[in-house]
Amino acid sequence: MKKSLFLLVFALLLSGCSLLPSAPTPPTTMQLTNSKISVLTPSPEITNTITPIPMAEKITATIHTSEGDMIVNLFPDKAPNTVANFVGLAKGTKDWTDPKTGQKVSGKPLYSNVIFHRVIEDFMIQGGDPLGTGTGGPGYKFADEQVDEKYLRGTIAMANSGANTNGSQFFIVHRDYPLPNLYTIFGRIDASDTASLAVLDKIATTSTAPGDKPIKDMVIKSIDIVEE
């Protein structure tokens, strides 16, 4: 009788174990309006307020990549905080936190030698993550800016994981795309700049592995900023 009771209890315990839920998945998925497209950008722990700084009326960013250069005309009049953040991280004049070490970084450009970690032909190319995985950032976040522009070919905008969670990740639109106004637009490649658009095409059409990561690294070597 005791043996039968023990076996019954043991069987119940085993069946109970099978009902234990699996570990929860961290909420890191960010949708770009299309359910087939998601990028990973966890919410940073530190909230950063971008202090507006005097900027030139015309600012261009030359993104030097392993595939060639793309010249982007920034919009300091329409998205001053976002442009100030991008320029500071590109030049190394803005402090950020290295997600690999947790250490504060000063005087070093964040974008140098960072890859475009997610590429979707006819949609966009995304980069700006120091980890190169889609889960990294500068260790802070800042608010969206409402910009009355469309996501046309060559447009550069901030990636985010929800409202007011901008950091360092950005994307460049490959083809005109009907996105809602949820991602701060802060610049664009000139439609007549065929050389820059050819580089965009080359990166956007590269072969990718599952998860939309290029098989061959598409590297941002550095970003030069010119203010006029």
Q: What feature does the model see in each segment?
A:
Residues 17-228:
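Cyclophilin-like peptidyl-prolyl cis-trans isomerases
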